[in-house]
Amino acid sequence: MSSLAVRDPAMDRSLRSVFVGNIPYEATEEQLKDIFSEVGSVVSFRLVYDRETGKPKGYGFCEYQDQETALSAMRNLNGREFSGRALRVDNAASEKNKEELKSLGPAAPIIDSPYGDPIDPEDAPESITRAVASLPPEQMFELMKQMKLCVQNSHQEARNMLLQNPQLAYALLQAQVVMRIMDPEIALKILHRKIHVTPLIPGKSQPVSGPGPGGPGPSGPGGPGPGPAPGLCPGPNVMLNQQNPPAPQPQHLPRRPVKDIPPLMQTSIQGGIPAPGPIPAAVPGPGPGSLTPGGAMQPQVGMPVVGPVPLERGQMQISDPRPPMPRGPMPSGGIPPRGLLGDAPNDPRGGTLLSVTGEVEPRGYMGPPHQGPPMHHGHDNRGPASHDMRGGPLAADPRMLIGEPRGPMIDQRGLPMDGRGGRESRGMETRPMETEVLEPRGMERRMETCAMETRGMDARGLEMRGPGPSSRGPMTGGIQGPGPINMGAGGPQGPRQVPNIAGVGNPGGTMQGAGIQGGGMQGAGMQGGGMQGAGMQGGGMQGAGMQAGMQGASMQGGMQGAGMQGASKQGGGQPSSFSPGQSQVTPQDQEKAALIMQVLQLTADQIAMLPPEQRQSILILKEQIQKSTGAS
């Protein structure tokens, strides 16, 4: 007894008492006391009565002086027959007898645990999972809604509730997984994190954070499992409860590796809860429409680029989605429908849009990646161009230079490339690099075959320029005009329709557009033909050299102004060829002539550094100029 005296009074009493069940309703405490005193001295015997009716419930408790006597009573009196009933004698500390013993004094009411039957902590996770899974969807939703309101309205109270009832927190977490509110993997991470932290707080915290929006405070869903605590030992029970969700999972993992939390989560997952992984953002638009560094969407190749100039080409959408190669942003406005150098399937440049993207029309993209060292050295002379080449030294990626000039695009050509409008980005734009530059037909074989056919540079070639200079004045029309520079047709290019050029025969070789567009000097000097805006920039001299050389429409105006050596050649060689507007040399023509001269001044080494097509285009250009000069 002395050893027992130090124990908790309630615990000591439970150990010295026995539970007596199946007692006849007519039996009295005195009769029962006499029977149980057979094994030892009985301190007290109490029958339990219904509080409302006052009738006996059919069971009671017998308290002995020591635990040994109580154990003897359980061994000897269990099954003892009394008034036709076999008495059931058991340990008073088991099951709900604990609650009864606590209030053993005066008419203590029987207290049923609100958590349900006690459960081994090791089985708590599975029990909670089953409880949550058994809830109808409507009830689960209602519980989660209530819990959300509870958290929003009484944050601290909700937190304390979950901390004190970890089984509830775990149930809410499980419910979120079942309802697909939370990814099972995230739930598992939360549980493991809890484990690593202090079991109580982490476990609670985790559910709190996760379940915040979750299930109702009611212990219903998961409460039953882990929460048998209210019994005699509230302190220990609480600890167990708190640890239950986390403890079983981490602590029992060795014993029940799968059963623990992971299994629960797995079960919920099996239930069909798809792990809510982040939804990958849809790829914006078709490949061609990738965002350029500026953030603007690059027009898709297939789309008519004409409208979207918003995208500053100057930005040089090097990030063409398709080809890794940096291409200038496709000019939104005047991309030739197709005839870019890059278009040609056999275009050796490989950087051409077509070769890179394949299905994408070259015009969709400004130009193939610059090839060869930028030979822009000649640009500067071009006049206003020094800065316009995208503001960067021409040395920069030729494409960038040419294409970039998003600004007024004062293309070095001196023409406000911006104005080019038609030429738009193409001429100087990043597009210059665009295959359009050496539109297949321009610099391509056609260019070779008859691209710069004598006629191309011929009086007619210059002639086309006649209308060209004026119309192309702004370069907008001249270079490819707002409309696509249809190099292929060789017909009059948009605004700059040069009937003669169109007639010039080789559609590819004609000087359509501003220069030898068809011939390879389309737009701004072989723009379409091969010196796209930047003078072969895209296809021909994509490098800065040709860019500057052909860019400003150097080939275009150059052929006219320079090729024919200003107005003198023009009038002398084929006065009739020039259109009426051509009779007088405009500043633009002079600038073009200067650009052409720059291209012609490229050294053999510089020309050798260019891609084959570009090299050939320049050679053809020189040859045509020589012929034109000789003819004049």
UniProtKB/Swiss-Prot annotation:
Residue spans of the Sequence repeats: 428-432, 433-437, 438-442, 443-446, 447-451, 452-456, 457-461, 462-466, 508-512, 513-517, 518-522, 523-527, 528-532, 533-537, 538-542, 543-547, 548-551, 552-556, 557-560, 561-565
Domain RRM: 16-94
Entry comment describing in which tissues the protein is expressed: Expressed in testes, where it is restricted to pachytene spermatocytes and spermatids, and in the brain (at protein level).
Gene Ontology cellular-component annotations: nucleoplasm
Superkingdom, taxonomy of origin: Eukaryota
Cited PROSITE patterns: RRM
Presence of keyword Phosphoprotein: yes
Region (Disordered), start-end ranges: 201-296, 365-433, 519-590
PTM annotation (Phosphoserine): residues: S579
Spans annotated as 8 X 5 AA tandem repeats of M-E-T-R-[AG]: 428-466
Pfam families: CSTF2_hinge, CSTF_C, RRM_1
GO terms for MF: RNA binding
Annotated spans, 12 X 5 AA tandem repeats of G-[AT]-G-[MI]-Q: 508-565
Compartment(s) where it occurs, according to its Swiss-Prot or TrEMBL record: Nucleus
Skewed-composition ranges (Low complexity): 234-244, 365-375, 544-557, 575-584
Keywords: mRNA processing, Nucleus, Phosphoprotein, Repeat, RNA-binding
Protein name: Cleavage stimulation factor subunit 2 tau variant
